[in-house]
Amino acid sequence: MSRLWITGYRSYEIGTFGDKDPKILVMKYAIKQLVRQQLENGLEWVLTGGQLGVEQWTIEVVLALKKDWPMLKVAMMLPFEDFGSQWQPNSQSKLQVLKQGVDFVDSVSHATYQGPGQLQNYQAFMLNHTDAALLFYDPEFEGKAKYDYKIIQQHQRKTPYPLTLIDMDQLQDYATTYSEQQAENDFFE
């Protein structure tokens, strides 16, 4: 597998506040562990979007991992041309910084937002340009990623397409492991 689509919860859907929120540290830890596993299986490209939450955290994690795995590439694909233009200025600035850091950035639609068809075209693009997906989503805790989950399931009925679904129980396991590692690091410092 060489191209992985990573997406999931938006930051507001899991109640994170500020860049130092412990939930964000756990999410980034989980992303890092999962991307490392995929690197051992031949991962070359991570494709994600620019949404606040899992997608932007993924870009930050992959950019950090590139220090040890320089062959790893990350692409930010956006559904339409003016993506993020309605956000708060600090969120817009963060998006711009991430755009400058990735290996490739483009919009699937080169028009400004016209309607939900652009989002569906974006999903189709991501499915057709990746070999598998990693989705941070739990059907019992709905969020906008439910639309990606549904389209991936539909795609799987037509063609083999591996999906790794990280639910809340698995996130709790990552939180426990992360907490134990932090306590161990604090003990030995």
From Swiss-Prot:
It comes from the Bacteria. InterPro entries: YspA. It holds the Pfam family YpsA. Belongs to the UPF0398 family. This is UPF0398 protein LCK_00599. It comes from Leuconostoc citreum (strain KM20).
